[in-house]
Amino acid sequence: MAVSKEEILETISNMTVMEVVELIEEMEEKFGVTAAAAVAAAPAAAGGEAEAAEEQTEFDVVLSSFGSNKVAVIKAVRGITGLGLKEAKEVVEGAPSPIKEGASKEEAEEIKAKLEEAGASVEVK
């Protein structure tokens, strides 16, 4: 007389928590396995998939090139970053250069628009 999976599950669902714990311990001893390893591995796999599905929240704005109007781009970089003239000029001339790291999507888009308006090529990563 074979017992079906449904009957086993029905029996387990009628047990108390302590009885289920004892059953698991006995199964671990009988079959030489541990339930903790399987339980610990499952959430890690699910968590990795969930992180990949989440939308990116932090963006880096990178100045690719300053284009034909370097002076306007330097002014825009100074306004965005608060750098001095010399530092802003070094950032612009050293393109590709990060302008802002860890910015929100809205902030990154605003910075990109300001720099492109000044004539620069900009990437948001």
From Swiss-Prot:
Which InterPro entries does its entry note? Ribosomal_bL12 (IPR000206), Ribosomal_bL12_C (IPR013823), Ribosomal_bL12_C/ClpS-like (IPR014719), Ribosomal_bL12_oligo (IPR008932), Ribosomal_bL12_oligo_N_sf (IPR036235)
Could you list this entry's UniProt keywords, alphabetically sorted. Answer: Ribonucleoprotein, Ribosomal protein
Q: GO CC annotations? A: cytosolic large ribosomal subunit
- Gene3D superfamilies xref list: 3.30.1390.10, Single helix bin
Which protein family is it in?
Answer: Belongs to the bacterial ribosomal protein bL12 family.
Give the record's subunit note: Homodimer. Part of the ribosomal stalk of the 50S ribosomal subunit. Forms a multimeric L10(L12)X complex, where L10 forms an elongated spine to which 2 to 4 L12 dimers bind in a sequential fashion. Binds GTP-bound translation factors.
UniProt-recorded name of the protein? Large ribosomal subunit protein bL12
